[in-house]
Amino acid sequence: MKKYMPFIHGAVAVAASLAVQVAGAAQLVIAQVAPLSGLEAIQGRAYSAGLQLAFNNANKAGGAGGHTFSLVRKDDGGRPDDTIAATTQVLAESKPIALAGYFGNRSIAELVKSGILEKEKIALVGYRTTEIRPDVPYVYSVRAGLRDEITKIAEHLATVGITRLGLFHEDGPGAAALTAAVDEITKKTGSTITARATYPAGTARVSPAIDIFLKTPPQAIIMLATGSAAAGFIEQYRLGGGAAQLFAQSGADIEQLAQRLGEETMQGIAIAQVTPSPYKISGRLAKEFADTVAKTPNLEVPPSYAMMEGYIAGKTIIEAARRMGAKASREAFVAALDTVETDMGGYRVGFKPGMRSGSRFVELSIVTGAGKIRQ
């Protein structure tokens, strides 16, 4: 059996040598500030592992554009204040050319609000939230947006005649925009949100929300929640006798749910996925990922959708570095990102100035009675 142990991100001393402007090829430092402990630690570590797998492949092949890659990461525990502090620290200490793999509605909102990205002229490539984010400079998504996920779920429900829906989501700064988007999308599919409930941002306190759905039962509930909140909701809702079909957005993390909940509780749960499955060979990207995992000893965590997403983010960074050429700078890297148009083999990522959402890929995974995942 493969063992999963912490991997070591070396070359930190070399990492600190990369200035914002480098005349010639260099080792490029990528910094991740993410929940490596706390409620969402499994996903944060999996994303990190995916980034590292991509960078390892590139380094073994001689780099990209003459550059090799080093990943430096810091733990924010899912706390927005720590996200800002750790980002400020890693920018000063390690001089990264890009950031990657950030998590959480409030953490990313605070990062954007802080002005750090504009001040440092540094891109964030790849992040996970449960809200609909506006397109802003320096923030690049390598996955489909939450609007795409909601549309996929709503269209599927409409095709099977389910029109009375519940909405469960985090009560944060983006809640108003989120609910407006859900109302717009469901109206187009002929559905109606008949019950709404929230949970406090940054927590997994779901009991009040469950009471609302038990009192006003919808046919299906759309869960726009973190993995820990979604797991708590599913568990308590089923124990309370809730019978609605449950649909979650990709951030709910199907592996975390399966680890916490039994097969009977998980049966019939559907989750929108924004990457190809890491568990089956469905194209060149999936095969490359599977082969890389098989050849990598001592992975920190088991393969997962979050790891696949980190791998995609890593490959996107590598492609931007290739396009940037030998003279490395944050400004040149951002300019190169805006030209990225790449087919990874079953998954396309593309950006251009003013369009920083790089993918529209969404498919639904459903957990069967045997606890298996099928698309």
Please report, for each region that a protein language model flagged, where it lies by residue.
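N-terminal signal peptide c-region/cleavage motif recognized by signal peptidases
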Residues: 17-22
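Beta-alpha junction/loop-to-helix N-cap segments that form part of ligand/metal-binding clefts
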Residues: 29, 42-47, 61-133, 231
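Extracytoplasmic "Venus flytrap"
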Residues: 31-52, 74-80, 103, 168-176, ...
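Extracellular/periplasmic Venus flytrap/periplasmic-binding protein
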Residues: 85, 137-241, 280-287, 291
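Extracytoplasmic ligand/sensor domains, especially the bilobed periplasmic-binding protein
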Residues: 96-194, 245-263, 267
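Extracellular/periplasmic periplasmic-binding protein-like sensory domains
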Residues: 234-308, 367, 371-374
